[in-house]
């Protein structure tokens, strides 16, 4: 609130043109499980494009691990999501990490958060060598 070195949020639509700019940080909360799964690839392509080398992307929300839910409540939430929109649903972390890696983003932290959510932190690689070393 009132910080002079932090920009106001920039709202992006994965189906629209993204700005020709570069940023140090991107944050998305409770989005991947709401959007249709076919939009995850353009999401990561956009993030990979706008982040500076060494920049961070933080994703907050529920995820599955090896196709398994982390809790019964997440399994129920996934059913609810799919009843409202069959193209939505809690995403597999392995798919998320793979899509991120295709866009020079490496997972550096995976933290448990309240209410069966995770905070995933991806770092934009600084060179081709760093990408191949971490993939």
Model-derived regions: residue spans:
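Core SAM-dependent methyltransferase catalytic element
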Residues: 104-135
């Amino acid at each position: 609130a009132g910080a002079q070195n932090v920009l106001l949020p920039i709202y992006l639509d994965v189906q629209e043109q993204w700005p020709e700019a570069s940023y140090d940080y991107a944050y998305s909360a409770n989005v991947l499980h709401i959007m249709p799964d076919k939009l995850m690839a353009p999401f990561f392509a956009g993030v990979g494009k706008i982040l500076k080398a060494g920049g961070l992307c933080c994703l907050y929300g529920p995820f599955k691990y090896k196709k398994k839910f982390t809790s019964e409540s997440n399994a129920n939430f996934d059913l609810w999501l799919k009843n409202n929109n069959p193209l939505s649903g809690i995403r597999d972390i392995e798919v998320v990490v793979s899509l991120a890696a295709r866009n020079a983003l490496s997972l550096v932290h995976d933290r448990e958060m309240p209410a069966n959510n995770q905070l995933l932190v991806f770092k934009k690689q600084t060179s081709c060598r760093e990408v191949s070393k971490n993939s």
